[in-house]
Amino acid sequence: MKQYLALMEHILAHGAVKTDRTGTGTRSVFGYQMRFDLNQGFPLVTTKKCHLRSIIHELLWFLQGDTNVAYLHEHNVSIWDEWADDKGNLGPVYGAQWRSWPTQSGKAVDQISQIIEQIKTQPDSRRLIVSAWNVGELDKMALAPCHALFQFYVADGKLSCQLYQRSCDVFLGLPFNIASYALLTMMVAQQCDLALGDFVWTGGDTHLYSNHMEQTKLQLSREPHALPQMNILRKPESIFDYQFDDFELVNYQPHPHIKAPVAI
């Protein structure tokens, strides 16, 4: 994950000092891109230990269209707790937009089912896009979507995915986002009988929080290890039928975890 460390170095060297919604303060750059060949290993950061269980369960939760943290709590995942109300609800965040985007007619669009069908039947389409940025419902969401839109691309029998992330917490959030969308790309490729291509990450306001600087410097002092491999142990009937035990990460040798505060 040398690309990730290079991004951190770029922000430290060239980032602008900015204020932000949380009042924490950031050092930020605008418009940055990284590319990961998914045939060269699973892009999970090795310069600190990442909590893979949270990444997988969050993705499965999104795919079910769920927007209440109860499922996450059942699996000891607390990454959304700071934004949930007293009943565990988050409003129409990612899962709702992915699976039931409301239309003017009163119906809803299941973008995930739609995209799978389009990849299978129209692989050269330039409309293989899923969006979570529903302007009409932003005020109902506990947190506006950071990873706002992703697009699939099929060429030479390989599936690639590009994510546009309008706002990115590089130290805490980005390792999760890269791994989550890389895994989603693997799942979609399996469902569509395609080989793996690239995962491309594109960031808008790409920042390090001011209270993550020491942690960032510690991480930059560590030598990255070889990437692990992710195995999917079975092919479920649909994209919605994967379970946590279907995924096996092998040869993950990370440096120790680095604790840092979340900006809320």
From Swiss-Prot:
GO MF assignments: thymidylate synthase activity
An example Gene Ontology CC term for this record: cytosol
Reactions this protein catalyses: dUMP + (6R)-5,10-methylene-5,6,7,8-tetrahydrofolate = 7,8-dihydrofolate + dTMP
The protein's enzyme class: transferase
BP term (GO), one: dTTP biosynthetic process
Pathway entry: Pyrimidine metabolism; dTTP biosynthesis
Residues reported in the UniProt entry to bind dUMP: R21, R126, R127, R166, S167, C168, D169, N177, H207, L208, Y209
InterPro entries: Thymidate_synth/dCMP_Mease, Thymidate_synth/dCMP_Mease_dom, Thymidate_synth/dCMP_Mease_sf, Thymidylate_synthase, Thymidylate_synthase_AS
Subcellular location per the Swiss-Prot or TrEMBL entry: Cytoplasm
Active site residues according to the UniProt entry: C146 (nucleophile)
This protein's UniProt keywords: Cytoplasm, Methyltransferase, Nucleotide biosynthesis, Transferase
Keyword Cytoplasm: yes
NCBIfam families noted in UniProt: PRK01827.1-3 (NF002497), PRK01827.1-5 (NF002499), thym_sym (TIGR03284)
Protein name: Thymidylate synthase
Species whose genome carries this gene: Shewanella denitrificans (strain OS217 / ATCC BAA-1090 / DSM 15013)
